[in-house]
């Protein structure tokens, strides 16, 4: 009995990527950008806890529904062939039940917020649920992932300010560009396998222009973040952090220059530091 419980817990840990927190970081940092700006640097404890836990739960739910959507093809991809729904550690029914539990937990958190934010949360759930299936229907699944990873920023402004100002949409667009850029790097890791099994991605769409498009998206991210700083009259510490982020992007371009799988994956992981550096720049402005 104990062994069975341990096996199920391991399956839950693996399918929700508890052992791989990079996705949580990439979702958390932009949410914190928005929370700090929307709250003038001082989000109340309840707001901070609700959005922090919400990020962890929704990222976990997104991983579960992603694996459910890919359960019939993950075995054909080197990186994903040992996932729980492929190796039999978890059944499809158990995965759907787990997804439902996680969405229920997230909804419980959202009920602590205003009605306008509750309504916006419905969009967040829809984006999280449909993204995994977009890989079969569009060459731009990363666009849907970007929207899913950015929607929490809109919710943060809605809750903290009761409105969604221009700055919120600029941050949303900046994060959208950034997400497409780093997830294209991630898709470059699996590109050869994806072509064979018919899965679509921006890495396949951009083809030989992948590095140039990623660079353009990174420049757009920096330009939009700089514009946010200008609108909010942020000073040199924030500007210095945006310049540092530009340096990190340049390093990522060096990593992906030869399109080697391991290097592309390292470039993807490296984006955690971009999110952190931008957050530090924002936080300093409110000290």
From Swiss-Prot:
Subcellular location: Cell inner membrane
Pathway in which this enzyme or protein is active: Cofactor biosynthesis; ubiquinone biosynthesis
CDD domains: PT_UbiA_COQ2
InterPro entries registered for this protein in UniProt: HB_polyprenyltransferase-like (IPR006370), Prenyltransferase (IPR039653), UbiA_prenyltransferase (IPR000537), UbiA_prenylTrfase_CS (IPR030470), UbiA_sf (IPR044878)
Transmembrane regions listed in the UniProt entry: 22-42, 45-65, 95-115, 116-136, 140-160, 162-182, 214-234, 237-257, 264-284
Main subcellular location of this protein, as a coarse class: membrane
Membrane topology: Multi-pass membrane protein
A cellular component term, taken from the record's GO annotations: plasma membrane
Gene Ontology terms: biological process: ubiquinone biosynthetic process
Gene3D superfamilies per UniProt: UbiA prenyltransferase (1.20.120.1780)
Family: Belongs to the UbiA prenyltransferase family.
Protein name as annotated: 4-hydroxybenzoate octaprenyltransferase
Species of the source: Colwellia psychrerythraea (strain 34H / ATCC BAA-681) (Vibrio psychroerythus)
Native organism taxonomy: Bacteria, Pseudomonadati, Pseudomonadota, Gammaproteobacteria, Alteromonadales
């Amino acid at each position: 009995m104990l062994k069975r419980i341990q096996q199920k817990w391991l399956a839950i840990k693996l399918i929700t990527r508890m052992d791989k927190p990079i996705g949580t970081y990439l979702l958390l940092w932009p949410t914190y950008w928005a929370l700090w700006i929307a709250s003038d640097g001082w989000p109340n404890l309840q707001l901070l806890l609700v959005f922090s836990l919400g990020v962890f739960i929704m990222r976990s739910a997104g991983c579960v529904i992603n694996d459910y959507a890919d359960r019939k093809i993950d075995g054909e991809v080197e990186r994903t062939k040992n996932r729980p729904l492929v190796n039999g550690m978890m059944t499809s029914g158990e995965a759907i039940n787990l997804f439902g539990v996680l969405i229920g937990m997230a909804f419980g958190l959202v009920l602590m917020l205003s009605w306008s934010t509750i309504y916006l949360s419905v969009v967040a759930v829809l984006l999280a649920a449909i993204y995994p299936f977009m890989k079969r229907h569009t060459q731009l699944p990363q666009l849907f992932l970007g929207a899913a990873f950015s929607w929490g920023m809109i919710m943060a402004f809605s809750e903290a300010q009761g409105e969604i100002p221009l700055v919120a949409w600029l941050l949303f667009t900046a994060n959208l560009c950034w997400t497409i850029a780093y997830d294209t790097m991630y898709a470059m890791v699996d590109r050869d396998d994806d072509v064979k099994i018919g899965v679509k991605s921006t890495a396949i769409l951009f083809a030989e222009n992948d590095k140039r498009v990623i660079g353009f998206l990174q420049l757009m991210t920096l330009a939009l973040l700089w514009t946010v700083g200008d609108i909010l009259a942020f000073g040199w510490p924030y500007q210095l952090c945006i310049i540092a982020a530009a340096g990190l992007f340049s390093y990522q371009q060096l990593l992906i220059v030869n399109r080697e799988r391991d290097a592309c994956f390292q470039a993807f992981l490296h984006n955690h530091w971009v999110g952190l550096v931008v957050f530090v720049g924002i936080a300093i402005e409110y000290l």
